[in-house]
């Protein structure tokens, strides 16, 4: 009898124990490859699509593209929260891939049916018919669908793939393949798909994106029985919000200097928690302060010391995150404007080949791969050998700021050269744009700031007309140089100092650790 019970228990455990592992690898990687080709295929050439197919003015098309890219880069955080807190990664990926497929099919229909877009006209013509409200409405619905679909798979697919493995070494190997596949799909979408859109037809280009998305969706769903399904564990953002709420509700309480007046959590958390909250950002120490009205069961009024310290750790890096946002704004502005520059340059390579304007962005991806490889294998080890100490993370950030400033300066010089060439009646080769484009890597949240910056410049100056041949884009780049210099000195070189995590939080910082 006992033997039959054991056998029954083993059979009930076997299905879950057999899930996960390397048998899920082909499904995850094939899904990622198809979704990457589809996603980069439509987003890389969006500015050109809006200008040529919807007769939208160049600057307005750039701003719309920035908003779309901003959503694609920010909404994955929302998708990750939904996956972690409520649904799990696998259902979110399935639904998102299907939504993305619907959006790309709608984009394909827009390019196939003439009444879903305005009549075509010559680029830059003042007689172009604007799209109707119905046509714009359908376009925005399609873009909303592909944005939600792309955002829903960006982080969750990586997390779901890593969760299939138990050993850290296997997870690391998966991430290596993950990024290799991601870049392969991005390069394929930014070259083959974009070339098809501009040289064959937009209908065929979006159709190929739809096929890639459909195949990836079918592959992912067919492997569902092999996946290890992660259970929702709750969002870490909830704990951060609870600290703010608890501290605010007890804002009038007097901060104590006694260890026993603070809540240290229950069970294992209470044993590993800090004895006293640190003195930095003391206002939030009230969240862990025990008062007469507090209850251990009410975690929106009483948090543990460890939760308070976790919140402070996140709060300390906010200025650095803001620095990343502001330093990324010049990069994404450059990314947007360089497509407009490419449209008015000579993109021919020989008599029969013309580089698509949207494909220029693939240089960012290729350059990022090369630079990361060179840094990890050559530059950083050589510096450590010569200086007898490694580069700190903030020093690497500072070096990145310098290169971004140089990139903006080069962009300004190249644009001034291009304008001079245009006034002389000649067209400039698109290869000139490669030099300044190599230094830029797109970071998503800055697309919104880039949109606001372009709007501000357009309203206050005459530097950004719809025909940039009559504008001063070089002055825009010089303005971005100034922004980059101010950002570097105010945040990277001035505000930040290192903390030694092995020492007490209250210990005075060593001035030698200042980042310069």
UniProtKB/Swiss-Prot annotation:
Tissues of expression: Not detected.
InterPro entries registered for this protein in UniProt: MFS_trans_sf, POT_fam, PTR2_symporter_CS
Membrane-crossing residue ranges in chain numbering: 31-51, 67-87, 90-110, 138-158, 174-194, 201-221, 320-340, 362-382, 394-414, 437-457, 476-496
PROSITE patterns: PTR2_1
One GO term describing the cellular component: membrane
Record GO biological process: nitrate assimilation; oligopeptide transport
Entry membrane topology: Multi-pass membrane protein
GO molecular function, one term: transmembrane transporter activity
Disulphide bond pairs: none
Subcellular location as annotated: Membrane
Entry keywords, A to Z: Membrane, Nitrate assimilation, Transmembrane, Transmembrane helix, Transport
UniProt family annotation: Belongs to the major facilitator superfamily. Proton-dependent oligopeptide transporter (POT/PTR) (TC 2.A.17) family.
Purpose: Transporter involved in a passive nitrate efflux.
Protein name (Swiss-Prot/TrEMBL): Putative protein NRT1/ PTR FAMILY 2.2
Organism: Arabidopsis thaliana (Mouse-ear cress)
Biological classification of the source: Eukaryota, Viridiplantae, Streptophyta, Embryophyta, Tracheophyta
């Amino acid at each position: 009898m006992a033997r039959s019970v054991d056998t029954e228990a083993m059979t009930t455990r076997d299905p879950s124990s057999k899930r996960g592992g390397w048998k899920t690898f082909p499904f995850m990687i094939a899904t990622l490859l198809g979704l990457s080709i589809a996603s980069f295929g439509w987003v890389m050439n969006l500015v050109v699509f809006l200008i040529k197919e919807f007769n939208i003015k160049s600057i307005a098309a750039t701003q719309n593209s920035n908003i779309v890219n901003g959503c694609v880069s920010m909404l994955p955080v929302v998708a990750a929260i939904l996956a972690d807190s409520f649904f799990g990664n696998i259902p979110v990926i399935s639904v998102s891939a299907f939504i993305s497929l619907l959006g790309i099919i709608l984009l394909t229909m827009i390019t196939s049916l003439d009444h879903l877009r305005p009549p075509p006209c010559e680029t830059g013509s003042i007689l172009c018919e604007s799209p109707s409200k119905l046509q714009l409405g359908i376009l925005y619905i399609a873009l909303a669908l592909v944005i939600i679909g792309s955002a829903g798979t960006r982080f969750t697919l990586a997390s779901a793939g890593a969760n299939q493995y138990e050993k850290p070494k296997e997870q690391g190997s998966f991430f290596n393949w993950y990024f290799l596949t991601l870049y392969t799909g991005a390069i394929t979408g930014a070259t083959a798909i974009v070339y098809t859109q501009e040289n064959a037809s937009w209908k065929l280009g979006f159709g190929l994106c739809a096929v890639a998305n459909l195949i990836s969706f079918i592959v992912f769903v067919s492997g569902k029985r092999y996946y290890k399904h992660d259970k929702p564990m709750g969002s870490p953002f909830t704990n951060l919000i609870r600290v703010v709420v608890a501290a605010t509700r007890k804002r009038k309480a007097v901060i104590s200097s006694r260890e026993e007046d603070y809540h240290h959590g229950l069970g294992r958390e209470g044993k590993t928690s800090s004895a006293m909250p640190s003195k930095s950002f003391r206002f939030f120490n009230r969240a862990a302060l025990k008062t007469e009205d507090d209850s251990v069961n009410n975690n929106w009024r009483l948090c543990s010391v460890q939760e308070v310290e976790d919140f402070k750790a996140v709060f300390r890096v906010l200025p650095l995150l803001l620095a990343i946002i502001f330093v990324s704004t010049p990069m994404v502005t450059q990314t947007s404007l360089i497509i407009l520059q490419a449209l008015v340059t000579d993109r021919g390579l020989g008599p029969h080949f013309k580089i698509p304007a949207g494909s220029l962005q693939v240089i960012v991806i290729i350059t990022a791969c090369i630079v990361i490889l060179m840094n990890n294998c050559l530059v950083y080890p050589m510096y450590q050998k010569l200086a007898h100490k490694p580069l700190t993370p903030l020093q690497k950030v500072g070096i990145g700021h310098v290169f971004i400033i140089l990139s903006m300066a080069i962009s300004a010089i190249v644009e001034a050269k291009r304008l001079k060439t245009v006034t002389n009646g000649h067209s400039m080769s698109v290869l000139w744009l490669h030099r300044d484009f190599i230094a830029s890597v797109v970071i998503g949240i800055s697309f919104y700031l880039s949109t606001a910056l372009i709007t501000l410049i357009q309203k206050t100056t005459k530097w950004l007309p719809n025909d940039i041949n009559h504008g001063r884009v070089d002055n825009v780049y010089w303005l971005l140089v100034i922004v980059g210099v101010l950002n570097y000195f105010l945040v990277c070189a001035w505000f930040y100092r290192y903390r030694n995590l092995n020492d007490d939080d209250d210990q005075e910082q060593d001035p030698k650790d200042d980042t310069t």
